Design a protein with these regions (language model features):
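Conserved beta-strand signature within the Rossmann-like core of class I S-adenosyl-L-methionine
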Residues: 184-190
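A short acidic, Gly/Pro-enriched loop at the edge of an enzyme's catalytic core
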Residues: 145-157
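N-terminal auxiliary segments of SAM/dcSAM-dependent transferases
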Residues: 2-49
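Conserved Class I S-adenosyl-L-methionine
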Residues: 219-279
Length: 279
């Protein structure tokens, strides 16, 4: 039986509310459960990066120490994002620091006056504090949408592959602007799926900061994923419990492969690099 117009409208509202509820629950699962689980499974193997990776053509060739070389493609995403401005002698905040590999590398390589890594994952912060003993580097547990710092505390804020999980992304942008000093920068890299790109663009356009640059980096991230293929296999084997390998590993590999294909083929996913400045 065909729905009447008011019934269709009500049905649309219900579907919209259901989608909002699903997205809220999914974000809560990732923020409160999944990443703590990942820390529990991956910390014993000293996994200090959780991003997709990045490589240019021709290759970037960032000089790395032997101890950093095996994390090259993860590091290069951090390097390309952070070097949009000069961080030497600056006070830097990273929101969504994960397992701290990027924070450690940038502190050692770019010589900021101080570097603070913030994450909501308490297990991850405990791991970072134990794993990364670098002068000028510290880690704080906290919420990206309620940054636990005074106004105008930092010269730069770094945010990489994290904001797609924030329930109130505009609130995050407002908090970044609040803790930045005048003239400070947001150095930002993340992705959105097709259904969220228009909203993302509108939210960034309304940000209380001026956009200095933006760049689509799908090809570079896909290339990084290709170079890290062995890492993905090892991580999936570590994350999926042994009893579930027979039925859960293949779907996990397929999800990663679909993301790679979408980035490589110009599909529905867009990964972008941005630089913003506070007036």
């Amino acid at each position: 039986m065909a729905l009447k117009s008011h019934e269709r409208g009500f049905s649309g509202v219900l579907v919209g509310k259901a989608n909002e509820t699903y997205e809220t629950c999914a974000r809560a699962f990732y923020k409160k459960i999944l990443y703590r689980y990942l820390t529990h499974r991956l910390a014993p193997d000293d996994v200090v990066f959780l991003n997709y990776g990045y490589e240019e053509d021709p290759p970037m060739g960032v000089p790395l120490s032997p101890s950093d070389e095996h994390n090259r493609f993860f590091i290069q995403l951090y390097h390309r994002t952070a070097t949009q401005v000069d961080l030497n002698g600056k006070h830097v905040l990273e929101v969504g620091c994960g397992h701290g590999g990027g924070a450690s590398y940038l502190t050692r390589a770019l010589h900021p006056a101080s570097y603070t890594g913030l994450d909501l994952n308490s297990a991850g912060i405990a791991f970072c504090r134990e794993r990364h003993q670098v002068a000028g580097l510290n880690f704080v547990e906290g919420d990206a949408e309620q940054l636990p710092f005074p106004d105008e505390s930092f010269d730069a804020v770094i945010n990489i592959e994290s904001s797609h999980l924030y329930a109130q992304f505009p609130q995050f942008l407002a908090e970044v602007a609040r803790v930045l000093r005048p003239g400070g920068h947001l150095l930002y890299a993340d992705f959105r799926f097709a259904g969220g790109i228009a909203t993302w663009e509108a939210q960034l356009a309304d940000a209380p900061m001026r956009m200095l640059s933006q760049r689509l980096i799908n090809a570079e991230v896909a290339r990084g994923m290709e170079n890290n293929s062995h890492w993905w296999v090892a991580v999936m084997n570590a994350v999926v419990p042994a009893f579930a390998h027979s039925f859960a590993l293949v779907p996990s590999y397929q999800r990663v492969w679909k993301t790679h294909q979408s980035l490589q083929d110009g599909g529905p996913t867009e990964y972008r690099l941005y630089c913003f400045q506070k007036a």
